[in-house]
Amino acid sequence: NRGHARCIATGLKYIFEKEEFDYVIPMDGDGEDRPEEIIEFIKSSEKAPDQTIVGERIKRSEAFIFKFCYFFHKIITLVFTGHSIKFGNFTCLTKSTVEKMINEKATWNSFSGALTKVEKNKFSIPSIRGERYFGPSKMSFSNLINHSLSIISVFKNTVLIRSALFIII
């Protein structure tokens, strides 16, 4: 996922510097971000044109073990950062959000962590994780741990304070 974050950061920087746009919808091309849900992002952006929209996962298509590990990842992230991050790359970003993202160093390491950090004016729409077009996911347990640490690293000051409080209490 860090590779994905870097690719998205590169694309956002390019689009911001070279193209005229109102919104950008980053998404995976492997089938897990369902193209038919783009229409919901567009409808939502018409209702709230100044807000960034995130696709909140309401259903996943992976095996039970991965779902369990992913749940554990979300809990760890919440405990250490104070943020419940229930979205990935599949978002509809306003131009002002894209500008904030390209100016945030953490964007190159964790897309969802950086977006949570820089954009308070966002709302979510439900998103069902689609079936992959080709082959199984390469997200192993160790990759999921690295993904968690990437998100947590965005909020290092919060993590330090929370860790100190956990030790004291």
For every predicted segment, state its role.
Residues R2-I15, Y23-P26, P35-N109, E131-S142, ...:
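Acceptor/aglycone-binding surface of glycosyltransferases and processive sugar-polymer synthases
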Residues K18, V79-F80, V118, F155:
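Alpha-helical structural context
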Residues G113, K117-I169:
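Hydrophobic helical membrane-anchoring modules
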Residues G29:
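Active-site-proximal cofactor/substrate-binding loop regions of enzyme domains
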